[in-house]
């Protein structure tokens, strides 16, 4: 069985650097705006292997107004003091999995190379191993794609950085021993749900 153990978020909306520990059963709770959908949307990118904004905020049961750019540049509203707009930076969403059959761990993730001119490039990657202690941060800054490739090559001999999302999805599913992309469509549907607004009706 493959189990999700950790989620690393760097420069993802208002998360500058956060490691989320994951157990067998998890309860994600908090008031509106606490960041529940922000975490789920990040997780979707890695698990679905795509960056389509149509998937964002489905768990909140509201018409999604969120965009990939808004998440990356922390620019969901005006006058946000944490906005990264106009800056060069890197964003990381990385998941560490445990394989209790192979008795090892592996990592699936994506980094976004974001530029001050508004351009961005996504780079999905997979390697056998755990999240590094430095969390892909050197000298206080998240690694750019050049430094990431160098770091992975030096520390994880079988690491792969993929040129296309399709190539990443194919290898990610293979790592899970899944050979049909239909499971990804099922995962999309599973995220959207209707919240409980009347506890008596629920009972």
Where do the protein language model's features map onto the residues?
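Extreme N-terminal "head/tail" segments of very large remodeling/mechanoenzyme assemblies
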Residues: 1-141
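Extended, charged alpha-helical "arm/stalk" segments used for dimerization and assembly
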Residues: 101-202
């Amino acid at each position: 069985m493959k189990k999700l153990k950790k989620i690393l978020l760097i420069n993802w909306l208002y998360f500058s650097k956060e490691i989320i520990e994951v157990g067998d059963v998890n309860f994600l709770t908090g008031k509106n705006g606490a960041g529940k959908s922000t975490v789920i949307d990040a997780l979707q990118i890695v698990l679905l292997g795509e960056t389509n904004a149509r998937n964002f905020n489905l768990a909140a049961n509201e018409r999604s107004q969120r965009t990939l750019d808004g998440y990356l540049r922390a620019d969901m509203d005006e006058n946000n003091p944490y906005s990264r707009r106009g800056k060069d930076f890197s964003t990381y969403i990385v998941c560490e999995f445990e394989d209790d059959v192979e008795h090892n761990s592996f990592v699936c993730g994506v980094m976004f190379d974001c530029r001050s001119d508004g351009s961005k490039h996504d780079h999905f990657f997979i390697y056998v191993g755990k999240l590094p202690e430095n969390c892909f941060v050197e000298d206080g800054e998240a690694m750019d794609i050049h430094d990431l490739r160098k770091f992975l090559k030096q520390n994880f001999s079988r690491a792969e950085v993929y040129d296309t999302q399709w190539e990443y999805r194919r290898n990610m599913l293979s790592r899970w021993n899944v050979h049909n992309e239909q499971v990804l469509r099922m995962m999309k549907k599973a995220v959207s749900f209707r919240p409980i607004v009347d506890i008596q009706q629920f009972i």
